[in-house]
Each structure stands twice: as C-alpha cells, then as structure tokens.
Curated annotation (Swiss-Prot):
Reaction(s) catalysed by this chain's protein: Hydrolysis of Pro-|-Xaa >> Ala-|-Xaa in oligopeptides
Source organism per UniProt: Galerina marginata (strain CBS 339.88)
Effect annotated for changing residue 661 to A: Impairs catalytic activity but still binds both 35mer and 25mer substrates
GO MF annotations, alphabetized: oligopeptidase activity; serine-type endopeptidase activity
Homology family: Belongs to the peptidase S9A family.
EC number: 3.4.21.26
Sequence segments annotated as region (Disordered): 1-34
Name of this chain's protein: Dual function macrocyclase-peptidase POPB
Length: 730
C-alpha cells in the first residue's frame, strides 16, 4: 500500500455568504433556505482562485500515492488492443468502418480497397485505407469528431467537431473523394468543402434522400460556446451543401415554447419528413409528418400533426409506402411496434409487434426491406429476434449470448450486423446474410482480442436482492475467478438510476485490471429510475419516487456485505452525471460506515436550482419542480447539498468535474464539496474535489493520455481509501 498522509481540516478557506432563497412548501408554507455558496455559481476571479486552491489540494494528495503511476501504466497497457466497429457498405461501392490500433485518442474511419466485404483477418491496413482520421483535427487532441453521417448516395461526408469536449459543435462537409489522413495533412491538404454549420447541439445529422443537404438542430449564436445560462430557442434547420449557414432554412421553431428541443428523420424512400418535439427528458414526444416533393425541403412546410399530445414515446422505424412503423410505449410500458397508415385522413393505430410483459423492446431495425430485427432486454440481458413482414417472430439469434447487443444496417441491403459485448466479452461483430443458406446466415465476422487481460479469467453473475420497500432488484457481480466470496474482498459499486437509461453490461479493460490487481469485485445494480424494465421501472425512481433510487443503491451495498461478497467498510461507489447525484445522495442518506469511498463525477447536487442552468429545465420531468410547493416537499429532503449532516463520519470522497461542463454545470460539485468540508471539517477521511481546468465537456472525448490519468487518479484514490494492496493475480 502506498503511504499517503492526510491531515483532517486542512482545506482551503471557503467564504460563506448570508444569501437565503425562499421557497413555498405545501406542508410548511414559506421556507427560507440558506445558500451560503451561491457565489460559486458565477464565473469570477474569486471562484477561479478557489477552484485553483481546491484542485491543488486534491492533486497534492493524489501525488503522494505511488500506486497511481503504477496503475496508469497498467491501464495504458490493458487499453492497448485493436478496437473496431461493424462495417457499412455505401452507395459509392466501398465498405467503411472505424478502427483503433489501441491507444489512439479517437478511432479512425477506414474505407475498403475493394467492393467486396473485407477479409479482416488480413489486417485492417491491408484491406482498407484511411478515409478520415479525427486525430489530425488538433495536434493536442483538443478537437474531436462527435458525430458523422454519409449522404445516401455516398458522395458526401458530414461530420461534427467539438472542442475540449463541449456540447456545442460545428458541422463540416467533405466529398468522399477527399480523405483526411496524416499524409494529407502533412502535404498541407485539408480537402473539406466551404460549408461550416455552427451552434449544433443535442442533435444528429439527417440527410435528405436526394443527398443535396441535411437537417440539424441548432441554438442561437452566443459569445461563449459553453456557459451556465439556460438553453433556449432551439431550431430545426436545413442546410444545402455548398451554401452558407445564413442561407439555411428554418424548418421549425416554436417561439411560444423556447425550451423545447427537436429531432427529425426522413423516410427511406424520401417521401416523408418526420419532426419530433420534446418538452423535457420524459419519454414523451409529439410526431409531425410532412410530405416532400421533388423540390425537397423548402420554407413554409405544411405539417400533419399525427401525434399532437405528450402522451407517449414515438420513434419511427421505417415505412412501406404510406404505412409507417413506429416503436412506442403507448399503453405499453415495455414498448411495442405499431403501424399508422398516413394515406387515411384519420390514421388508425394498429399493433404490429405486441408488447411483451416480461421484456423491454430496446431496438428495432428494418432489414432486407421487409424483415425486422428486434432486441429485447429481459432481466437486463439482451435477446435478439428476427420478425417477418407480418410481424411474426421467426427465430432467435445468438441464443447463448449474455450481454448487450446493438444492430447496424441499411434497410435496403440483404445483410445486417450485430455488435455483442459484455462485462467479460470485449466485443464480437456478427453478420446475418439473407442470401445465404438458412443454416449459414448467421456468422461471426470478427472478434476483439485483448492483449494484457484474458477475459476468460473473469466471470459475471446476476443476483437479486431486496430493497428497502421489498422490491426485488437485480445486480451484476463481476470478479476475477481467483477472488473468493468470503467477505474479505473490496467492492466497486457503479450506478446511474435515471432518465430511463439502462445500466447494461459493458466491457472495461480498466475495471478488469483493477479487479485483477486488487482482488476486488465490481457490482452494477439495476436500480429504479433506469430503463431496465421499461417505463414503470423508470417511474419507480423519478420525481416523488426518486427516493427509491437511493434506497435501491444503498441496499445493494448492504446486500454485498451481508452475503460476504464484500468486506464491511470496503464498498466504494462511483457514478457520473445523474450517477454523480446518486453517489452524493447515497453518502448523505446511508448509515455511517456503509461506504468506504465515493467518487461522484460531474453530478447534480443542488436539486433546488438545477433547472436554472443550461439544459437543466428539461430535467424537471425527472427530478420535479422545486418552484411548485407540493414538489418542493419531496425534492428538498433529497437534495445532497442541503442534507449533509454535521455529526456523521463521511467516506473518503473524491469529486471530479470539468471546469467548463456545459451540461451539469460545475457549481453542483463546488457547492457540495464546500458543504462537506464545512460541515465535517475534522472528518478522518479526505473530502476532495479534482477540477480539470482545461476541459469544457461533460466527460466525453478526452485524449487517451488524459483518460488514463483520470482513471488512475480515481482508482488509485479508491484503492488507498479502502486500504488495498497492489498485487497481480496469476
């Protein structure tokens, strides 16, 4: 164990103001709520000096831990293996796929040398050429490609570039005859077109069938790409290739609802333009449809309001003529597929693939024009099925697979690909070919090979435990096979629990390296608020039932100790974004000694003010509105920053945040650490905040070196807090 000294109370001075906000409570009337750290919401010289002092303290503590450098070396080695995506055949006659040699900060987009599906056993560089290398966008790794889409005819490539991980990005366009590689940059050739589409955020790129342009969502120009003011006045626009952004058509904007955001899609045959409207992050949206003629997208579009009330989630799958197939949770919390015939004045909704009561329909794609590939999530394990054009289930694919799956295909092609991964499955690409003999249609295209780890040395199991209110909760437990369940191991417990997002099995060489190095286990409970069991599971952990999310997470740790999966006091918890709220709320609510360490990353801590910054107003559907008295009464007791006790020993805590996070603004983390340090200044365990003052984003897109350092700091802190000895399990 690395020797690290800690002197309680050695924190930077944090000014406390007499600022008080007043809220209305349905049960108590007017409630004054002190906010002594309200000044940390601003961007001032005082805040800058405070963040520097806090960051320096955290770094000085981490620098004492010699294990961190050793972990960084191990993590870097464990990440050094080839990674790849499923290939896609475009209309230019080439296959395209992403490939990463191992430690590249961003995967490189390759293009096949020949029209045939590449034989990847010969090596990616032998069967393909670099088409687009995002690593050359900025020498220091500060620019990243966050999204890309090819035009339907395969002639254009549109890609969005973000700087320092920020949510705002700019779309550029290039011809597919103009690759971007290390070689082209060395020759001083960029090759992109003049198109420059700015202020792109929370959207995708939707090409029209004629390949003349694309739709996208943008926000009004602002002085700074990131900031804390609310996101408002989004607009869905159409950009024609070869024109300026000033010439773009505003396809839709609702000035009466400036907080709403939009999505769009076009039908495979180019006949329909679909517009989605969202008022928040709830699984409910409007669906409008417009018919396009030979002139394509133009001003003054006439919209048919097919769904004009926020009652359910609607997501277009495809259309066969005027018959549109939609994945929805309308009267089906586990989701189903319906059809609507747009040729009728009063479209009738018909079930196509009915809801399954014990499995959530997670993804549906149309394949080979008339078949449907569906992924169901049953007990947090993905199952893949093929359906006929009549909605009849034909077969199950990869029945022995346990993990998470995704589908990649183009509707008109006679094949589709599946990406399969799990806690100890680094990644397999499978192909289904409709033209092959039936017994040969499903095959493995390529499998990820990990260099420094043997995935077969690890195993994952699923257990069920009882939460505080008696609800049964599933939880995955991952371990190196040499680690015993005898009550001596440390446990890393990870969670999210919000926004109907499922905590699916995922492969992490860093986590497996930590488990192997320290003989620990990794636990992922499927807590309420997530989407593992459909919308009812989500509703069981949002707004007035949000307390269940924390109770489920705390009960998971107690179960691990009681059943000898973990040692008492050696459960460390980790989560990011909404998962950061989960971690902060759990250490505040749990009995003393439940957790040995906590690392909340970029989390929400002030539940009385979250809706006043950037996109936070969209989260009211998840957390509630503190301005409404009845909702204030259940929000206030859950808000982490307002419920830190002064008489309770807190676990070793390392909060991590990026100074320019434009999604969950850093004031949440700032206020929470200031409150912890003030309320329990003599806490025997460190209460620290690591602030990355060079990064804008919410945590995504960091260069490899920065990611490895962050991981080593986090896991090294946890190892020290739990008193773990660095070792290697043979």
């Amino acid at each position: 164990m690395s020797s690290v000294t800690w002197a309680p109370g050695n924190y930077p001075s944090t000014r406390r103001s007499d600022h008080v906000d007043t809220y209305q409570s349905a049960s108590k009337g007017e409630v004054p709520v002190p906010d002594p750290y309200q000044w940390l919401e601003e961007s001032t010289d005082e805040v800058d000096k405070w963040t520097t002092a806090q960051a320096d303290l955290a770094q000085s503590y981490l620098d004492q831990n010699a294990d961190i450098q050793k972990l960084a070396e191990k993590f870097r080695a464990s990440r050094n293996y080839a990674k790849f995506s499923a290939p896609t055949l475009l209309d230019d006659g080439h296959w395209y796929w992403f490939y990463n040699r191992g430690l590249q900060s961003q995967s490189v987009l390759y293009r096949s040398k020949e029209p045939a599906l590449p034989d990847f056993s010969k090596g990616d560089d032998n069967v393909g050429d670099v088409f687009f290398d995002p690593n050359v966008l900025a020498a220091d790794g500060s620019a990243g490609m966050v999204l890309c889409k090819f035009s339907p005819d395969g002639k254009f490539f549109a890609y969005a570039v973000s700087h320092l991980g920020g949510d705002y990005s700019t779309i550029y366009v290039r011809s597919t005859s103009s690759p971007l590689s290390q070689a082209s940059v060395a020759q001083g050739v960029d090759g992109r077109l003049s198109d420059e589409v700015k202020w792109f955020k929370f959207s995708t790129i939707i090409w029209t069938k004629d390949s003349k342009g694309f739709l996208y969502q943008r926000y009004p120009a602002r002085e700074r790409h990131e900031g804390t003011r609310s996101d408002r006045n989004a607009m869905m626009c159409y950009h024609k290739v070869g024109t300026t952004q000033e010439e773009d058509i505003i396809v839709y904007q609702d000035n009466e609802h400036p907080e709403w955001i939009y999505g769009a899609d076009t039908s495979e045959d180019g006949k329909y333009l679909y517009l989605y409207q969202f008022k928040d992050t709830s699984k409910k949206n409007l669906l409008w449809v417009a018919e396009l003629d030979e002139d394509g997208v133009k001003s003054g579009i006439h919209w048919r309001k097919v769904v004009n009330e926020y009652a359910a989630d609607y997501n277009i799958i495809t259309n066969h003529g005027s018959l549109v197939y939609i994945k929805t949770n309308l009267n089906a919390p586990q989701y189903k597929v319906i059809t609507i015939d747009l040729s009728k004045d009063e479209p009738e909704i018909r079930d196509f693939i009915p809801e399954e009561k014990d499995a959530k329909l997670a993804q549906v794609n149309c394949a080979n024009e008339e078949y449907f590939v569906a992924i169901y999530k049953r007990n947090v394990k993905d199952e893949i099925y093929l359906y006929s054009k009549a909605g009849v289930q034909l077969t199950r694919l990869a029945p022995d697979f346990v993990g998470a799956a995704s589908i990649a295909n183009r509707q008109k092609q006679t094949h589709f690909f599946l990406t399969l991964s799990g806690f100890n499955t680094p990644g397999t690409i499978a192909r289904y070919d409709f033209t092959a003999p039936e017994t040969q249609r499903f095959s493995i295209l390529r499998t990820t090979k990990v260099n420094e780890l043997d995935p077969d040395d690890f195993e994952s199991t699923q257990v069920w435990y009882e939460s505080k209110d008696g609800t049964k909760i599933p939880m995955f437990i991952v371990r190196h096979k040499s680690t015993k369940f005898d009550g001596t191991a440390a446990a890393i417990q990870y969670g999210y629990g919000g926004f109907a997002t499922s905590a699916d099995p995922f492969f992490s060489p860093i986590i497996l390296t930590f488990l192997q190095t320290y003989g620990a286990i990794f636990a992922v409970p499927s807590i309420r608020g997530g989407g593992e069991f459909g919308e009812e599971w989500h509703k069981g952990g949002r707004r007035e039932t949000k307390v269940n999310t924390f109770d489920d997470f705390i009960a998971a740790a107690q179960f691990l100790v009681k059943n000898k999966y973990a040692a008492p006091g050696k459960v460390a918890i980790n989560g990011a974004s909404n998962g950061g709220l989960l971690v902060m709320g759990s250490i505040v609510r749990a009995p003393e000694g439940t957790f040995g360490a906590a690392v909340p990353e970029g989390g929400v801590a002030d539940l009385l003010k979250f809706h006043k910054f950037t996109g936070g107003q969209a989260w009211i559907s998840e957390y509630g509105n503190p301005s409404i008295p009845e909702e204030f009464d259940y929000i206030y007791p859950l808000s982490p920053v307002h419920n830190v006790r002064t008489d309770k020993v807190m676990p070793a805590t390392l909060i991590t945040v990026n100074i320019g996070d434009g999604r969950v603004v850093p004031m949440h983390s700032f206020k929470f650490i200031a409150t912890l340090q003030h309320n329990v200044p003599q806490n025997p365990h460190p209460l620290l905040i690591k602030i990355d003052k060079s990064w804008l984003g919410h945590g995504m897109g960091k260069p490899t070196d920065k990611n490895v350092k962050d991981a080593a700091d986090k896991w090294g802190f946890i190892a020290r807090a739990l008193g773990l000895e660095l070792k290697t399990v043979e």
